[in-house]
Amino acid sequence: MELIRIAMKKDLENDNSLMNKWATVAGLKNPNPLYDFLNHDGKTFNEFSSIVNIVKSQYPDREYELMKDYCLNLDVKTKAARSALEYADANMFFEIEDVLIDSMISCSNMKSKEYGKVYKIHRELSNSVITEFEAVKRLGKLNIKTPEMNSFSRLLLLYHYLSTGNFSPMAQLIKQIDLSEISENMYIRNTYQTRVHVLMSNIKLNENSLEECREYSKKALESTNILRFQVFSYLTIGNSLLFSNYELAQENFLKGLSISVQNENYNMIFQQALCFLNNVWRKENKWINFESDSIMDLQEQAHCFINFNENSKAKEVLDKLDLLVHNDNELAMHYYLKGRLEQNKACFYSSIEYFKKSNDKFLIRLPLLELQKMGENQKLLELLLL
């Protein structure tokens, strides 16, 4: 018997009113499906969200333990297992996901097999095991049949473009996703909808459509209880306010920080965001990470040194960065910082060039503002912003 059934039965012995509470949390019209679930091993709910919501409300500190045990005991040929695969990926529970992927690929159910193969490509692309070209080629060979994987095959490419700073293809690709085709599995449809909201908020941020950016982030927050999506929604709202409202940007970053205290990776993301915010506004910066050698953290070290006229230290860091391989978006920031240090117009124009190559219409403001201060033609700068 799975751990979740054992835990629920034990709690019911002490408080039988929990049955009605759980039915409400699970979105059930009455407790009957709960009785079936508790009294028949292998029985699942019609929608995966029911078990997720019960675990989150009753056992929040044991979610990973209970859901791992539950997911890995599911028959991989079922709708519940396919939902579990999306649950694992959405929550970045990769140990659960990888076991499910391997089991699904080798199972006899064609639908589950297709899910396994598509999510396998997603994992390998995310981990740089394969290139974008190889991913697209393998997806094409699958001749995808299910509407869920038709959508996810596009979502996985969108995540790749976002992570590599290649924003140019994203707006057109996301238009190809039609979630109305998904009718069998509402859990997957709803999580994919949240994914689309989060991705759209990033697309709108990089298009400099900031009101729309915040609207998509708010839709994501309203539609999910998944920490990952909540975190990146607060992050994007904060980023959208980066140049216009220091206090509100900081407020959203701190909200994200507060909900991610137990997640080291998310905690680091918000510390980096708060660091960048303080550097942009040229404030005292307690968020600098002097222990890290990542490109982002090194750039923010240099950024802080430049703000406080510690030019020799800034140059030392930028010289170190010159030896590292950057993507276009990172190069844009690198040239912006060199321009700040040297008061060099050519560097600011190089920064603009690379922001344009990565299609980042938001952070391109950084070099444009510096050129404006240097007296460059305002009309020219407005044209460069297009």
Swiss-Prot record:
One of its GO terms (biological process) is latency-replication decision. It comes from the Viruses. This is AimR transcriptional regulator. NCBIfam families: lysogeny_AimR. Coiled coil: none annotated. Keywords: Activator, Latency-replication decision, Transcription, Transcription regulation. Homodimer. Interacts with the viral arbitrium peptide, this interaction changes the oligomeric state of AimR from an active dimer to an inactive monomer leading to lysogeny. The keyword Cell membrane does not apply. It comes from Bacillus phage SPbeta. Transcriptional regulator which is part of the latency-replication switch system that decides at the onset of infection whether to replicate and lyse the host or to lysogenize (latency) and keep the host viable. Activates the transcription of the aimX locus. Transcriptional activation of aimX seems to lead to the productive viral replication (lytic cycle), aimX possibly acting as a regulatory non-coding RNA.
